[in-house]
């Protein structure tokens, strides 16, 4: 009975707060409130600003190689495993794939900022 009462009160309170949050902002609508916040930029301007694709590729490459650190961090704890050959082979394969990816990026001139 006590649990049912707590569940009922929580449900009613949650529903009441959701309804207040839904209807309260609609009471006083004005023009500035309806506009999106664009950090000082003109919200009616073009959304298609020029973006450097080279910067995007360097950022993605950084994220991929940064993920390497997250994958290699557990290695000191994995050394304490009984089957160290599996851990060594796995880390060697991971580092080899990353080295091949770095070599490919280098050969494709993906690491050069200027063209």
From Swiss-Prot:
Keyword tags = Electron transport, Membrane, Mitochondrion, Mitochondrion inner membrane, NAD, Respiratory chain, Translocase, Transmembrane, Transmembrane helix, Transport, Ubiquinone
Q: How does the UniProt record describe the way this protein sits in the membrane? A: Multi-pass membrane protein
Q: Name one GO molecular function term.
A: NADH dehydrogenase (ubiquinone) activity
Cite the Pfam families for this sequence.
Oxidored_q4
- Which cell locations does it reside in? Mitochondrion inner membrane
What is the protein's major site of localization? mitochondrion
Catalysed reactions, as listed in the record: a ubiquinone + NADH + 5 H(+)(in) = a ubiquinol + NAD(+) + 4 H(+)(out)
State its Enzyme Commission number(s): 7.1.1.2
Which biological process terms from the Gene Ontology are attached to this UniProt entry? mitochondrial electron transport, NADH to ubiquinone
**Database matches in InterPro entries:** NADH_UbQ/plastoQ_OxRdtase_su3, NDAH_ubi_oxred_su3_sf
List cellular component terms (GO).
mitochondrial inner membrane; NADH dehydrogenase complex
| Domain of life of the native organism | Eukaryota
The task this protein performs is described as: Core subunit of the mitochondrial membrane respiratory chain NADH dehydrogenase (Complex I) which catalyzes electron transfer from NADH through the respiratory chain, using ubiquinone as an electron acceptor. Essential for the catalytic activity of complex I.
* Annotated family: Belongs to the complex I subunit 3 family.
Q: How does it assemble?
A: Core subunit of respiratory chain NADH dehydrogenase (Complex I) which is composed of 45 different subunits. Interacts with TMEM186. Interacts with TMEM242.
Q: What is this protein called?
A: NADH-ubiquinone oxidoreductase chain 3
Organism the protein comes from: Peromyscus eremicus
């Amino acid at each position: 009975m006590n649990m049912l009462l707590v569940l009922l009160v929580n449900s009613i309170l949650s529903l009441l707060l959701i309804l207040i949050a839904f209807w309260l902002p609609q009471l006083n609508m004005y023009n500035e409130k309806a506009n999106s916040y664009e950090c000082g930029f003109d919200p009616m301007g073009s959304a298609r600003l020029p973006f450097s694709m080279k910067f995007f590729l360097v950022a993605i490459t950084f994220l991929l190689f940064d993920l390497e650190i997250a994958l290699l961090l557990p290695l000191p704890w994995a050394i304490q495993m009984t089957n160290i050959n599996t851990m060594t082979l796995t880390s060697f394969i991971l580092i080899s794939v990353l080295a091949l990816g770095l070599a490919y990026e280098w050969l494709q001139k993906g690491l050069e900022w200027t063209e």
